[in-house]
Amino acid sequence: MKKVFVNGYGSIGSRIIQFIKDDPEIEVTGVGKYSPDSKVNDAIEKGFKVYVPEKNQNAFSNFAISGNIESALDESDLVIDASPGGQGFKNKKLFYEPRDILSIYQGGETIDGEKSVSNLLFNSKVNYDDAIGQKHVMQGSCNVTGMGRILEPLRKNFENSIKRFDVT
């Protein structure tokens, strides 16, 4: 069984955890929360342990949090980073790389430049085999994923005929 921590419990993280929580091969170790809002109680009411950045614990004093994000990561095999855009790169450097923990990042991050979270933008239809063995992978947004699922079969079947794709 894989122990998975979802770091970020907003519009993306709350959906991800609802999807993975019933998988018999996954144990959800908890969720990371960055802002002390109603989503904290929402996660707790749904039975999830909530962890917050150690430096922000005082801001969450009105909530029944389970500890700091660092301790949750120490108990996890994989983290799905659904934190606010740009925070994933900071988390990678501060938390994930020092712990050598496998990480999947949401579409608000980048695969380009010095703040790149990965060199791979994952799409199961396009580069599934390339993701095997990677420590850090970025999952594209729903729009990017959808385009990959449509465009990859076209590229595969009509590679010599297609000069370019225009997507609007």
What are these language model-derived features?
Residues 1-168:
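N-terminal Rossmann-like NAD(P) cofactor-binding subdomain of oxidoreductases
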